[in-house]
């Protein structure tokens, strides 16, 4: 099986960037919808969708 890294590498970079940005945002937020440990687990365990869920559902509106 030959892996085309030209197609996969941008997705890996996107996933890592989203996860890091979401984790930093989760840590810095004073209040979230649900416990922070739960959001950290979702961000880390559910690729690409976890960080998107945090930004759409997890953050409290100011």
From Swiss-Prot:
Highest taxon, organism lineage: Bacteria
- Can you quote a single GO CC term? plasma membrane
Q: Which UniProt keywords apply?
A: Cell membrane, Membrane, Transmembrane, Transmembrane helix
- What's the short name of a Pfam family annotated to this entry? PLDc_N
Q: Which residues cross the membrane?
A: 7-27, 37-57
Q: Which InterPro entries match?
A: CLS_N (IPR027379)
Its localization reads:
Cell membrane
Which factors induce or repress this protein, as stated in its UniProt record? Expression is sigma Y-dependent. Induced upon nitrogen starvation.
Q: What is the topology of this protein in the membrane according to its UniProt annotation?
A: Multi-pass membrane protein
Q: What does this chain do? A: Together with YxlD is important for negative regulation of sigma Y activity.
Which protein are we looking at?
Answer: Negative regulatory protein YxlE
Which organism encodes this protein? Bacillus subtilis (strain 168)
